[in-house]
């Protein structure tokens, strides 16, 4: 059920994630979060209209929201259809339901593997809770826009399916972030790959280069002319050409590559600029020099 009204402005998108407990809702909400959706876990349907009213009052022109609604909401879950009808009347939000399902045997196996209790299994037997939940969700499943059976899916496959269905063109852009930094200011905690280039000859000890940075030709030419730098560039070029397509294939949205030297002024900046320019012809690339303005610290 897609809730739309022709002729009215629709500025917000809502994806309601629901379905059987153990069918993959946690993986789903994480996938939507990676796509840039504002995500809410375990939102009671009775509060959905209140939340959307606050969203409208915020004045934001466009927002994408993904909300998990499941049987943890108790009796509130009965309010879901009423909340969707309310959205239909307002007409400024496109709402879709993603229902995640799996066969009974798979759900029982998953509960046993995690050693968690089914939320509706009063007797303690997962199958009893599964049967009760399936009956309670039958109407919602019938009104869903998308029904994914995850019985034979791995988490990665579910994520790929969600990305294929719900990602915009902007969401699928893979970005390589190239960073320079100084070890004396601490290692970057968000880097995927860190390369220590302190083994290269340091321009800091060349008096006329000391006050300059790797952004200036005198320093970059000095660093790039070193034999060790040329060998490093050759090896890292081969490594990046091999690895980066595989990172993209794995579904990563970004890769952070950091080059570190002592202070983050000369060698790391030069290498970050070089590989930023090299990768820019292949990938969406962003260059950041974290410590370049911390010379006196």
UniProtKB/Swiss-Prot annotation:
GO terms for molecular function: ATP binding; GTP binding. It comes from the Bacteria. GTP binds at residues 70-73. ATP binds at residues 19-26. Pfam families: PapZ_C, RapZ-like_N. Keywords: ATP-binding, GTP-binding, Nucleotide-binding. Displays ATPase and GTPase activities. Belongs to the RapZ-like family. This is Nucleotide-binding protein Bsph_0448.
